[in-house]
C-alpha cells in the first residue's frame, strides 16, 4: 500500500491527497480542542461519529441545492471531498444566545435572538480568529461582494434546513459555524460549502431537558461527551439499535445504563 501524501493537518481533521486530481481525503480525528486550542483532549470515537453526521448533513443539503465539497464517505473515518480554495472566513449563524455573544453583549444564555444573526470571523489561529465586519472582508479582498452574497444566502438556507431537521428529533440548533471554499472552472469560480457540520461546530440542546449534546460538554468539563455525540447520531438514525427520536434524553440515566456514574 502506497503512503498517502498529507496536505494539511488541523485540530480535528487531516487532509490527504486524493485518488484523482481535484480531490482530497478528509480524515476525522478523535482530538478535541477548545478556546483556540488552549485546551486539548480526546473524545473516543468522535471522528467516526462526526464523519457519519457530516456525511448525512452534507448529503441532505445537496438534495436542496446547496453545493458542497462532499463526494462520498470512504470508511469509518474518511470521506472523499473536492479540493477547494478555502475562503479565510468562519461564518457563525446564531439563533439563540450562547457562548461568545453572551459574554460580549451580556445576553443571558438561552435567550432566543430577535432574528437569525450571521457573524464573520477571520480564520487565523495566531490571532485567535478575530471577529470581523463585511467591510474588512471587502477591504482586504478575502471574498468578493458576489461571493459574500452567495455565502450569506447559503448560510441562511442551511440554517433554515438544519433548524427543521434537528427540531424533528427534539434538538434545538442554538448556533453553528460554516466554512466555504472556491472551486475553479477555467477563469471562473463558484462558492461551495466545505469543512464539516457536526457536534464539533454546532451547539445542540435537547428541547425537553436542555442537555448540551455538543462540544460544550468538553469545553465546560461537563463529561459525557461520547454519549452526547452518539445521542445526536442515534436520533438521526445513524446508529444501530435506534430507539427513535421521540425519547427524552437524560444524560445521567444514559451514563448509568453504560455503567458510568
UniProtKB/Swiss-Prot annotation:
Pathway: Purine metabolism; IMP biosynthesis via de novo pathway; 5-amino-1-(5-phospho-D-ribosyl)imidazole-4-carboxamide from 5-amino-1-(5-phospho-D-ribosyl)imidazole-4-carboxylate: step 1/2. The keyword Cell inner membrane does not apply. It catalyses: 5-amino-1-(5-phospho-D-ribosyl)imidazole-4-carboxylate + L-aspartate + ATP = (2S)-2-[5-amino-1-(5-phospho-beta-D-ribosyl)imidazole-4-carboxamido]succinate + ADP + phosphate + 2 H(+). One of its GO terms (biological process) is cobalamin biosynthetic process. The gene is purC. This is Phosphoribosylaminoimidazole-succinocarboxamide synthase. GO terms for molecular function: ATP binding; phosphoribosylaminoimidazolesuccinocarboxamide synthase activity. Pfam families: SAICAR_synt. GO terms for cellular component: cytosol. Belongs to the SAICAR synthetase family. InterPro entries: SAICAR_synt/ADE2_N, SAICAR_synt_PurC, SAICAR_synth, SAICAR_synthetase, SAICAR_synthetase_CS. NCBIfam families: purC. HAMAP family: SAICAR_synth. It is an enzyme of class 6 (ligase). It comes from Novosphingobium aromaticivorans (strain ATCC 700278 / DSM 12444 / CCUG 56034 / CIP 105152 / NBRC 16084 / F199). The keyword Ligase applies. Its EC number is 6.3.2.6. Keywords: ATP-binding, Ligase, Nucleotide-binding, Purine biosynthesis.
